[in-house]
Amino acid sequence: MGQKVHPNGIRLGITKPWISTWYADKSDYANNLHSDWEVRKFLEKKLEAASVSKIVIERPAKSIRVTIHTARPGVVIGKKGEDVEVLRAEVAKISGTPAQINIAEIRKPELDAKLVADSIAQQLERRVMFRRAMKRAVQNAMRIGAQGIKVEVSGRLGGAEIARTEWYREGRVPLHTLRADIDYATSESHTTYGVIGIKVWVFKGEVLDGMLPQVEEPKQQQPKRKPRGK
């Protein structure tokens, strides 16, 4: 049977950036890697309701910088930035180094595979019909500007005794094209009948000039300086 390679893994360094960007000596590498895992685990649990897509970790000069990509920055920041300060203190405690937390807003959550998968998972837990949840996610993504999307759910769908897999696709999702900007993510829905797995592929277009920018925030243009003496 044909198997699919992980769409993000095969594109690392081609069109996809890494989610941990640091260099370490042999003696520190394992500790840093485990620290990254613990920080991500803590933040994902703490920010479960904040629509977090991904967490990027950098380690400049014996410190840790965490960038949280979220569709609901207000939930992460909290009232007057109190929640961010609590998160910063916790991350510093886990990593054992001074921490800095940045928030990057996701402008179009309908095109983010992780947020789409989590949304479908939440709907299935609320007993929404799986076909309706899949179709709604696909229609929203295509309406916002996706060139293609595929959604796959597997498990005891609708409470059936025998588990099965169903999928729905619209547009094109070229998995073999390395320059294709394909966002892929998975999620789990814990229903009364058991766990249902969700996979989402979103094709946003082709990347023709190398790597994608990591942060989705638009750059502010600097005002032009007037020449002296005028």
UniProtKB/Swiss-Prot annotation:
Coiled-coil region(s): none
One MF term in the entry's GO annotations: structural constituent of ribosome
Gene3D superfamilies: 3.30.300.20, Ribosomal protein S3, C-terminal domain
Superkingdom in the source lineage: Bacteria
UniProt KW keywords: Ribonucleoprotein, Ribosomal protein, RNA-binding, rRNA-binding
Swiss-Prot/TrEMBL GO biological process terms: translation
Record's keyword annotation contains RNA-binding: yes
Listed GO CC annotations: cytosolic small ribosomal subunit
Domain (KH type-2): residue spans on this chain: 39-107
Pfam family, one: Ribosomal_S3_C
Job of this protein: Binds the lower part of the 30S subunit head. Binds mRNA in the 70S ribosome, positioning it for translation.
Self-association state and partner proteins as the record states: Part of the 30S ribosomal subunit. Forms a tight complex with proteins S10 and S14.
Family: Belongs to the universal ribosomal protein uS3 family.
The name this protein goes by in its record: Small ribosomal subunit protein uS3
Native species: Shewanella amazonensis (strain ATCC BAA-1098 / SB2B)
